[in-house]
Each structure stands twice: as C-alpha cells, then as structure tokens.
Amino acid sequence: MAGLRLIVGLGNPGSEHARTRHNAGFHFVEALAEKAGARWNVDSKLFGETAKVEIAGQTVWLLKPATFMNLSGKSVTAAQRFWKIEPEETLLAHDELDLAPGVARLKFDGGHGGQNGLRDTIRLLGHGKFHRLRVGIGHPGHKDRVVGWVLGRPSKDDEVLISRAIDDAIDVLPLAVQGDFSEAMKRLHTPK
C-alpha cells in the first residue's frame, strides 16, 4: 500500500475552538509540526493552513482546514488536487466519540460515523477510501449531549489522556508514512 503524503487535522478555526474536543485532529497535526520544527502558513487557495515536514525521510504535507468542520472536504480535496495526492495517500485525524480518551486507532476506508468533517470529505470524493486517525474523546452518555460535548473542553485528566494518545500515534506515524499500516496499527492498537 502507498505511504502517506498528506495528513489533515480536522477541527474548527478560531481561538474559541482551540482547546475543544472537536479539535483533536488539529491538536495532532500541531503536535507533528511542533516536533518537526515546522511553521504553519496560511494558504488561501487550499482554504487552510499548511506546513511541510519530513517523516521517515519523506516529505509530508500537513493541513488544517480553515473552513470549519462541516466544510472540511473543500480544503482536503483542494490540497489533494494541488499537490497531486491520491486519497489513499491521505490521512485525516479527527475526534472520535466511540473511543475513550487516551485511545487512538488507525483505520482505512469506511463511512463517516456521524463525524461531519469526514462526511463532507466523503461527499466530495465520492468514497471513503482514505486513512483515518481516530482520536478518542469519549461519549457524554446521551446523544442529546453530543454537540455540547464535542464543542466543550475536556477535563484536565482527559486532556492528558488525549495528548498521550496523540503522542502514541506520532510514534507509529513513520511506519504509516512508509506504507506499513499493518505494523503501525498493530503497535498503536496493542495496549502498553
């Protein structure tokens, strides 16, 4: 399988959203950029902010859509077209209600599971054949509380767990960039 050339963090722009659960995808790519010493640049033609990093000896583009979550696909598909990157060479990092804080999972293909950034990307691509990093944020317990939950800040304990899951995902990312997703999944999904 081809490696990764584009990693997108899904989230909402603006300081009021910066520390929310819904921005777990942004937190992931921001941590990657910080680790690599990369700087973010506004790129209006791609409807977001971009950074270039080197992982496992390969150039990888990072993207934070500035379109708000529900319209993320516009930015994702613009970047894929501009850099001539296939969906299969793309990873979307996003918050995941169905995983507990502290858990991160890699996945390829599938539906959107109610995640609006994935929903819009799938709508514009016409399929879901791209990689995902699902960063667990937990569930509030009842579907009527989901919107407030994802747009709210996690507790200090959950914030630590989410950061730990992001670090764990960063540790296996070189394998995914090189195309060894099965080993990356095995290492990320095996409890320590």
UniProtKB/Swiss-Prot annotation:
CDD domains: PTH (cd00462)
PROSITE patterns (alphabetical): PEPT_TRNA_HYDROL_1
One Pfam family from the record: Pept_tRNA_hydro
Single GO MF annotation: tRNA binding
Entry's localization field: Cytoplasm
Superkingdom as given in the UniProt entry: Bacteria
InterPro entries found in the cross-reference section: Pept_tRNA_hydro, Pept_tRNA_hydro_CS, Pept_tRNA_hydro_sf
Catalysis: reaction(s): an N-acyl-L-alpha-aminoacyl-tRNA + H2O = an N-acyl-L-amino acid + a tRNA + H(+)
UniProt-listed Enzyme Commission number(s): 3.1.1.29
Residue(s) at site: Stabilizes the basic form of H active site to accept a proton: D95
Site entry: Discriminates between blocked and unblocked aminoacyl-tRNA: N12
Record-listed tRNA binding positions: H17, F68, N70, N116
One of the protein's GO biological processes: protein quality control for misfolded or incompletely synthesized proteins
A GO CC term attached to the entry: cytoplasm
Primary location class: cytoplasm
Keywords of the record: Cytoplasm, Hydrolase, RNA-binding, tRNA-binding
UniProt enzyme class: hydrolase
HAMAP family, per database record: Pept_tRNA_hydro_bact
Function: Hydrolyzes ribosome-free peptidyl-tRNAs (with 1 or more amino acids incorporated), which drop off the ribosome during protein synthesis, or as a result of ribosome stalling.
UniProt cross-references to PANTHER family, sorted A to Z: PEPTIDYL-TRNA HYDROLASE (PTHR17224:SF1)
Subunit details: Monomer.
Family membership noted in the UniProt record: Belongs to the PTH family.
Name listed for the protein in its UniProt record: Peptidyl-tRNA hydrolase
Gene name tied to this protein: pth
